[in-house]
Regions:
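Core catalytic alpha/beta fold that binds nucleotide/phospho-ligands
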Residues: 1-214
Length: 214
């Protein structure tokens, strides 16, 4: 199907993956560039995700851009001023394009497993803010926010409790939140935005200076 939804400022979109990998590949012109990579992807699900992110990037940017990877695995666009972030979850792909270097997006399908692993990524202060009536959704927002922040800072040996911090917030279906990191030598704070959809949660970074809208 086409883009599930698209946002222009910042520029991002979510694609619901209903096509086969062959169908997705047919939507791209630079097929010969992709085949060597696809041959190394063993599962159909991963091939679908890999291709869907490129089809979505084409839809967002208006042209077919090749994705390269830094040594740490972070994707980038060699011939573009945009900075790129990509995320996948069960049946969905998300792509974010921003002019600022620190760009991060994360999307997660609903799963109660988040309740079992909350102690691995939530600080006591963050955990105390979780709405018991919306615990799964609230925790998924925290998780996605920290995943997006992790992508933004591009550091190794990151502890999600010690180094990645989300200012506790009251749950709502969408809002902006504040995040900061203490892993780098020059800690930074960031503004993130999230949305809770019927099947998934996603969080994305906002341009510097966006501030918090209440």
């Amino acid at each position: 199907m086409p883009v599930l939804f698209k946002h222009t400022r910042p520029l991002f979109g979510v694609w619901k993956i209903e096509e086969t990998s062959d169908e997705l590949l047919s939507m791209l012109a630079l097929r010969s560039e992709y085949l060597p990579f696809l041959q190394n992807i063993k599962t159909e699900k991963r091939r679908q995700e890999w291709l869907a992110s490129r089809v979505l990037l084409k839809e967002l940017s208006g042209s077919e851009l090749l994705i390269a990877y830094h040594e740490d695995g972070a994707p980038y666009l060699p011939d573009s001023a945009y900075h790129l972030s990509i995320s996948h979850t069960n049946g969905y792909a998300a792509v974010l394009l921003q002019e600022q270097p620190a760009a991060g997006i994360d999307i997660e399908y609903y799963s109660t497993r988040i309740l079992k692993i909350r102690s691995r990524f939530m600080s006591p202060e963050e955990d105390a803010s979780v709405d018991p009536d919306n615990a799964v959704k609230h925790l998924l927002v925290y998780w996605c926010a920290k995943e997006a922040l992790f992508k933004m800072i591009r550091q190794q040996d990151v502890d999600f409790i010690e180094h990645l911090h989300i200012e506790p917030f009251t749950y709502a279906d969408s809002r902006q939140i504040k995040a900061y990191e203490t892993r780098t030598g020059d800690p930074q704070s960031y503004t993130l935005s999230y949305e809770v959809r019927p099947d998934f949660v996603f969080v994305y970074s906002l341009p510097s200076g966006s501030g918090i809208l209440r």
